[in-house]
Regions:
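Hydrophobic, membrane-embedded alpha-helices of multi-pass small-molecule transporters
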Residues: 11-16, 24, 51-55, 64-116, ...
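Selective recognition of specific alpha-helical transmembrane segments in multi-pass small-molecule
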Residues: 19-20, 39-53, 107-133, 194-210
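Extracellular/periplasmic helix-loop-helix junctions in multi-pass membrane proteins
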Residues: 188-193, 208-228
Length: 255
């Protein structure tokens, strides 16, 4: 709805410029903007869920397990990217002065995010019957299109798109910052800011590579199958290896 008359080649550079500025100003300003904007996003989400209640149909959630436990547990591994933000929390942990408080905040964020995700998924399943509910992209946007308050107010998705755009900018800025930070410590660089421009340019080029929604879905599924399992497995392996080295050093020092 927003900027629908503009070409994607015009919209993406604007987004990438805003993301680059966010990554350049640093983590603390991004966190402050996030703290100011999150209450508004929460109010919009809560209002959306309340307005969706008249459209709920309890019969739509059946069958509860869909195609069975196997499809949920084994085939559900393809959606492991939903938990990729946990890796980001570990990357940003060194910025926290109080590690114990940071861990509590991290767990709190995971619980809140999980609760919101369950509520959104439940609302989606209560509105869209099975098997239509199996295939969805940006479910909150699809839910917002259902809301109609008479002829006067029938485009609630406009509000969602505004809030979603700001959240994407904040989210992407944090990831670009984290990526540049990881490269900084990996290659022992003095500053991370010179890395922002090439990262933003490469990200913008990759964003325009899919020629259609079908290609985008295919690339996303490929990432979920190959990239994210490796991304989760490597920290676990390095963790076990580091613990083994630490225990060996402790034994040598004691002996």
């Amino acid at each position: 709805v927003l900027l629908q008359d503009f070409e994607i080649e015009f919209i993406i550079p604007i987004f990438m410029l805003a993301i680059g500025i966010g990554a350049y100003i640093g983590l603390e300003p991004i966190a402050r903007v996030n703290n100011m904007f999150m209450p508004l996003a929460g109010i919009v989400l809560l209002l959306s869920l309340i307005l969706l209640i008249p459209y709920f149909n309890i019969n739509n959630i059946f069958p509860i397990l869909g195609n069975g436990v196997y499809s949920i547990t084994v085939k559900g591994i393809n959606t492991i990217s939903l938990f990729s933000d946990i890796l980001l929390l570990n990357i940003l942990l060194p910025y926290c002065e109080n590690t114990s408080e940071a861990k509590k905040s991290g767990w709190r964020a995971i619980y809140i995010s999980a609760t919101i995700g369950v509520v959104i998924l439940l609302s989606y399943c209560l509105i869209y019957p099975y098997p239509v509910s199996r295939e969805f992209m940006i479910p909150v946007y699809q839910l917002s299109r259902v809301i109609h308050l008479g002829n006067f107010f029938s485009r609630f998705e406009v509000i969602f798109q505004f809030v979603w755009s700001i959240l994407v900018l904040i989210y992407s800025s944090i990831y670009v910052y984290a990526l540049c930070y990881v490269w900084q410590i990996t290659f022992d660089l003095k500053y991370y800011k010179p890395l922002i421009l090439p990262v933003v340019i490469i990200s913008g080029i990759v964003a325009v590579l899919p020629s259609s929604v079908v290609d985008l879905v295919k690339s996303e599924r490929l990432e979920n199958i190959i990239v994210y399992p490796v991304a989760f497995l490597l920290p676990i392996l390095f963790g076990f290896y580091s613990k083994k080295i630490y225990n060996k050093r402790t034994v040598n020092e004691e002996s």
